[in-house]
Amino acid sequence: LGVSAKTQHNEVAPAQHELAPIYAQCNIATDNNQLMMEVMKKVAYRHGLVCLLHEKPFAGVNGSGKHNNWSITTDDGINMLDPGKTPHENFQFLLVLGAIMRAVDKHADLLRESASDVGNDHRLGANEAPPAIISMFLGEQLEDVVMQLIDKGDATSSIQKGKLKTGASTLPDLNKDATDRNRTSPFAFTGNKFEFRMVCLLYTSPSPRDAH
């Protein structure tokens, strides 16, 4: 089919699985997503099973949704959401970040509406799903830069990645993620992109983008 997957693993709920295709341009990623859902249903049926593409088929256990990755890249390959090692000095990135923050704040109602249906409204707010209220999570590093801009009108420093010490002498220290990933934030910055995590499982992938 030509659809490359990044991960495929079991999830929390019984007989629940995750399949994550590799990032692609919006139109290609959308086609891949629709193709995957259709093929999964057909293959399950051939084996006497049913592939439930429903946000909350069973009460009391984790439901299912999608992560919609938002990135902006120029025609010559520059990622507008790459903060670099010193985000406080990356004025292009800060401009794009500020525009997205303003857009999410101004149009939170449209984003929420784009993720609303009967099944998804039962999923949100419990069992590791994002809350039903739109909020953004930038991580410790970017939050500090933004607060410097708000408080002083200028940002002069960026928190750098720290080391994770395991306490085991046989294991090396590991680099910590400066974005401080939050698994349940509805709209979170994850390294060099945003993830919108409230998307309905059955909806076509561009729906939240169209709403925005």
Predicted regions and their residues:
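Well-ordered beta-sheet/strand-loop patches within structured domains
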Residues: 3-5
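Single conserved hydrophobic/aromatic residue that forms the stacking wall/gate
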Residues: 203-212
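Loop-rich catalytic cores of soluble enzymes, especially ATP-dependent carboxylate-amine ligases
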Residues: 1, 12-13, 17-38, 42-47, ...
